Structures are given as C-alpha cells and as structure tokens.
Amino acid sequence: MPQAIQTLLTQYLSEIQKIYGTHLKSVILYGSYARGDYTSDSDVDIMLLVDLTPEEMDAYSDALSELGYEYNVNYDIWMMPIVKNLQHFKQWAAAYPFYTNVQKEGVVLYEAA
C-alpha cells in the first residue's frame, strides 16, 4: 500500500475515533487495499464496528459523511466506511458472505482494548 494512503488512513482513523469515542470497537480495512490489488481508482473500504444500535448509529451519520466528503475533496480519495454493530457482526459473520469476506481478507487497523 502506498505510504500516502497509509498516512491518510492513520489520519482518518484518528478522526473516526473522535466521532465515535468509546463506542468504536474495531476498524477493519477490506477490499482491494487489504488484498493488495488496488488501482489508482480504488476506493478505501472500511468496516467500523461499534457498540451502538442502528438508531444510535444514525446520530453519527452526518459527521461520518462530512468526514468522507472532506477526504474526497481535499485528498481525492473515497473513504467508504460501513458501520455495523459489533455483536451483530460477530453473530452473523459465518452466515453472511460479506461479513465472512471482511473477516477473511480484512486487515484490522484498530481494536479497542
């Protein structure tokens, strides 16, 4: 992965932590950047696992969207976060092919202590 992308991911993770605080439990990079088969047009796929209900997650969606827009405009990169409840993800990881794929190919960028 290019150093510039690693640097942006580190910055992005810091901003995500500010948005979600202690509710953020794990951040997983998946997709082309995790597999190493990215191109110059690739977006950055990120799974954010939180301890919030879907209704509670809605309260954070505007801040998350604004952050994504900022990265697109300022750095010409698409950060594509998907936010899921951690327990839901764990419970259904074996049954949902998408979740299985994230677990299989994903690179953990952050894990709460």
Name the predicted role of every residue range.
Residues 1-23, 35-40, 51-113:
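Catalytic core of pol beta-like nucleotidyltransferases
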Residues 44-49:
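Short beta-strand->loop micro-motif that forms the acidic, two-metal-ion catalytic signature
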